[in-house]
Amino acid sequence: MPRYLSLFKYTPEARKGFVKEKAAAREAALKLTIESAGGKLELFNWTVPGSDYSGVTIAEFPDASTYTAVFALVKATGAFSEIKAVELLTASEIDRGLGTWGLVAQADKIVT
């Protein structure tokens, strides 16, 4: 399953609610959301005050469409001023890609 790293930043209003609800409640809510979509929350960490982002997550999803749906749902809450995400690749996925690149590089010699 594809894995995604997300950096998130709360809005000022959401930070106020965060103090009231506590970190564990926010983590539990996200875990439930991801699991209900067939994914798995692997990491949920907060950053120190003064950082550019409020926290970071790593989660696994069945596919990119599922990730996109969860991302849109979370963003629609209005609690985040910014969310940046990247898909993570394993060494074997990179190696497979490099193998494909070799085939593509040869294709330009074939198609003229």
Model-assigned labels for residue ranges:
Residues S54-E60:
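Short cationic amphipathic helices and targeting signals
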Residues E60-E93:
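An amphipathic, aromatic/His-enriched active-site/gating alpha helix that lines ligand/cofactor pockets
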Residues M1-S36, K40-E42, T47-Y53, S65-Y67, ...:
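Short S/T/G/P-rich N-terminal loop/turn motif that feeds into the first structured element of a domain
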